[in-house]
Amino acid sequence: MAMYTTMAILTLTSLIPPITATLINPNKKNLYPHYVKMTIASTFMISLFPTMMFMCTDQETIISNWHWTATQTLELSLSFKLDYFSMMFIPIALFVTWSIMEFSLWYMHSDPNINQFFKYLLIFLTTMLILVTANNLFQLFIGWEGVGIMSFLLIGWWHAREEANTAAIQAILYNRIGDIGFILALAWFLLHTNSWEPQQMILLNSNPNFLPLAGLLLAARGKSAQLGLHPWLPSAMEGPTPVSALLHSSTMVVAGVFLLIRFHPLTENNQLIQTLTLCLGAITTLFTAICALTQNDIKKIVAFSTSSQLGLMVVTIGINQPYLAFLHICTHAFFKAMLFMCSGSIIHNLNNEQDIRKMGGLFKTLPLTSTSLTIGSLALTGMPFLTGFYSKDLIIETANMSYTNAWALSTTLIATSLTSAYSTRMILLTLTNRPRFPTLTNINENNPTLLNPIKRLTIGSLLAGFLIINSIPPTSPSQTTIPLYLKLTALSITLLGFLTAFDLHLLTNKLKMKNPSHTFHFSNMLGFYPNTIHRTIPYASLTMSQNLASLLLDLAWLEKLMPKTISHHQISASVTISSQKGMIKLYSLSLLIPLSLTLLLIM
């Protein structure tokens, strides 16, 4: 047990030396990115041992405590919770980050601040691991805020771009709204349970009030970009592609879902919270899938697919299946990171072109990238025996057998079908037909720092689901029988989406849309939500504030009440009691006229 705990803690502490090295020796050499990459690779190897020991010994939870500080009413300690969720997530996050770091060596090679970029990515990963292993709300809040501030720094990495700065501010502001809910839950639990440790909170109050649970749901809504607080996620594509890959695969966006998974014992008996969670996830996964259908930016298509999959995870929590939601987090990390890296490879080779309408024919010039992009897209749609199939098929199957409402189930099924539709559209426009980019574009796919990480994640997208599904705890009692049509539901709607998208592409790829329909505008403009929230409401607020200021301050206060009114009354009284009118100009003129006439007569 001691050896197991020591190796698990060693995994976490192994990431600290590269961070502190930059403080001790600011004059870093060019080898620092390679040092960070090798550190993460070795840490991944180390993390496999405690994970395998945990799975083989059938441990449930191991908690390590170190006393930190104490107040009159609360004792705080550094508490690490090593359970199935944390032990499974750590090696997956390290493996994905290792691949992203190696990809960054190729993608960011010309950036003058590449060392700082690698340090930021490493801190980003470290704060996420702190969040995953935290056993009290205060420690979890440190990791929560850590991933928030690091996302702000990394999204706005190219700070000379106005769009990048705007996207970074959007991310931090929307997450501030979610943090209000987190702090509200912190305060409520401290007031009513006098503890921030989940075990004690569950024992003392197994069915808490609606208020803290709503706070946790609001926090997850902001961090995992659920409907209402979602616009920051597609805007975050203004950051470098490695940032997008890490942000969407195994760090920030899954933090909100992980929070709901961690505190699921508190929410599972509250029917109102479960219903709100289910409906929020269902409408998010459908809305973002609709938005992805008409996007032309390849990174935004992948970003909206992330938001749609996050909605599916929230739906899974809403039907009381946290282990299935966690399984989808693990499988999703592999193919989502690979999709972003394939997108980055295409963008980099096409001189920063991101419009899929200006691509085409890339399966000949970028064979590995094209193959990996196709595998990742198929895994995203849940094609059989790819990584995404093992989690997505189980989620649809469980939703069919659960006591959920028909609206949420239908919405989720439609979104699943749309996932295959926009994935097919992206593949057809990007990889097939003739090239629609300048023929003199220099395309090169021979760099090993590009090929190796994509190959690793491709293998993960093929095999990881099979390996993870065999180690997940039972999610429900074994079913003796299940109707065939329920078993084939996920596959049927996926194939329906494929066929529909392929048929529409063949029918319309030669047509020009002179007058786009209202439906197209709704999807392409993201439901007009950003325009409404970022333009209409601020403009109305500023106009109202300006009118109130001018009417209340200028007209009412200055004109009608105090300064001008007092001045007017004093002038009237002065004129009444004094014969001198104070007309200095007239007096001077009356003095000058006789003087002028006298001078004229003399002359």
Curated annotation (Swiss-Prot):
Keywords for the protein's UniProt record, in alphabetical order: Electron transport, Membrane, Mitochondrion, Mitochondrion inner membrane, NAD, Respiratory chain, Translocase, Transmembrane, Transmembrane helix, Transport, Ubiquinone
EC number: 7.1.1.2
Transmembrane intervals: 4-24, 36-56, 87-107, 114-134, 137-157, 171-191, 200-220, 241-261, 272-292, 301-320, 325-347, 366-386, 407-429, 457-477, 482-502, 583-603
Recorded catalytic activity of this chain's protein: a ubiquinone + NADH + 5 H(+)(in) = a ubiquinol + NAD(+) + 4 H(+)(out)
GO cellular component terms, semicolon-separated: mitochondrial inner membrane
Compartment list: Mitochondrion inner membrane
Gene Ontology biological process terms from the UniProt entry: electron transport coupled proton transport; mitochondrial electron transport, NADH to ubiquinone; mitochondrial respiratory chain complex I assembly
Superkingdom of origin organism: Eukaryota
Keyword Membrane: yes
UniProt cross-references to InterPro entries, sorted A to Z: NADH_DH_su5_C (IPR010934), NADHpl_OxRdtase_5_subgr (IPR018393), ND/Mrp_TM (IPR001750), NU5C-like (IPR003945), Proton_antipo_N (IPR001516)
A GO term for molecular function: NADH dehydrogenase (ubiquinone) activity
Any Pfam family the entry gives: Proton_antipo_M
Topological type in the membrane: Multi-pass membrane protein
Quaternary structure (record): Core subunit of respiratory chain NADH dehydrogenase (Complex I) which is composed of 45 different subunits.
Function: Core subunit of the mitochondrial membrane respiratory chain NADH dehydrogenase (Complex I) which catalyzes electron transfer from NADH through the respiratory chain, using ubiquinone as an electron acceptor. Essential for the catalytic activity and assembly of complex I.
Similarity-based family: Belongs to the complex I subunit 5 family.
Stored PANTHER family: NADH-UBIQUINONE OXIDOREDUCTASE CHAIN 5
Protein name: NADH-ubiquinone oxidoreductase chain 5
The organism of origin for this protein: Hylobates lar (Lar gibbon)
Gene: MT-ND5
